[in-house]
Regions:
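Catalytic, metal-anchored helix/loop core of enzyme active sites in primary metabolism
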Residues: 1-177
């Protein structure tokens, strides 16, 4: 990238949001990155009922329309483990600075907390159109038509810590250097 003076702009919503949130800041000033996860189709399922879960249940994501593999990865939260690893590699951020938060509505895609007291919260509709559009048409005056984020949505952002009993895949992050 440096050799060809090319800028890397991620397309995935969380990583695009980190990139966008860092545009006016340096990673050295970054205190914490919060990647959000919806919790998938089983967020409110009692642990006692996990034995009854079927593959078809896992494929029915409450917020996103995705393919089968990513739907399963989302339901088990292994996709967030991958995204933490990716964020570390792409942005050169230590694992200790990256945390996963549950945000069932999926409007917040990343939260960046800086050591100067500022926090960037990147919010957009639950569609990949937003990061893809902004990656392709960066710094243009084109407009994207999406559902508008409104005050009703912003009044209920609902963030929670990850329950590792419910999502044991997240424990894999404890084994990373």
């Amino acid at each position: 990238l440096k050799k060809h003076k090319t800028e890397f702009i991620p397309v995935d919503s969380e990583h695009f949001s980190i990139w966008y949130g860092l545009k006016n800041f340096k990673t050295i000033n970054l205190e914490k990155v919060f990647l959000t996860a919806s919790g998938g189709p089983f967020y409110k399922t009692t642990l006692n009922n996990f034995e009854k879960i079927k593959v078809s249940d896992a494929l029915n994501h409450p917020n996103w329309k995705m393919g089968k593999k990513i739907s399963i990865d989302s339901a088990t939260m292994i996709n967030k483990v991958y995204e933490v690893i990716e964020a570390k590699k792409v942005f050169n951020i230590g694992y200790q600075k990256i945390k996963i938060l549950i945000h069932p509505k999926s409007y917040i895609h990343a939260i960046l907390k800086f050591n100067n007291g500022l926090t960037n919260i990147i919010v957009h509709d639950t569609t990949m159109k937003v990061p893809i559009f902004n990656t392709l048409f960066l710094n243009s005056n084109r407009k994207l038509k999406t559902n508008k984020i409104n005050t009703k949505i912003l009044n209920n952002l609902d963030l929670n810590n990850v329950n590792v009993t419910r999502y044991p895949m997240v424990k894999l992050l404890n084994f990373l250097p």
